[in-house]
UniProtKB/Swiss-Prot annotation:
Domain notes: The cysteine framework is XXII (C-C-C-C-C-C-C-C).
Propeptide: 1-5
Annotated GO MF terms: ion channel regulator activity; toxin activity
PTM section of the record: Contains 4 disulfide bonds.
Name the record gives this protein: Conotoxin Cal22d
Top-level taxon of the source organism: Eukaryota
Tissue: Expressed by the venom duct.
Cellular component, GO, one term: extracellular region
Key words, A-Z: Disulfide bond, Ion channel impairing toxin, Neurotoxin, Secreted, Toxin
Described purpose of this protein according to its UniProt entry: Probable neurotoxin with unknown target. Possibly targets ion channels.
Location(s), subcellular: Secreted
Length: 55
């Protein structure tokens, strides 16, 4: 499968990923963090909480 976004998205700063992980760690269900870069949208890193198996 595709490597996790944390490694293959050079646009996501370590700080952003860490912040997202902090946010998600308190989430009972979606406690994994998925950071993705959307080339079609703004050049921003988008992080969201996901279920661990959906990473």
């Amino acid at each position: 499968g595709r490597p996790s976004a944390r490694y293959d998205a050079p646009y996501c700063s370590q700080e952003e990923v860490r912040e997202c992980q902090d946010d998600c760690s308190g989430n009972a269900v979606r406690d994994s963090c998925l950071c993705a870069y959307d080339p079609a949208g703004s050049p921003a890193c988008e992080c969201r909480c996901v279920e661990p198996w959906r990473r």
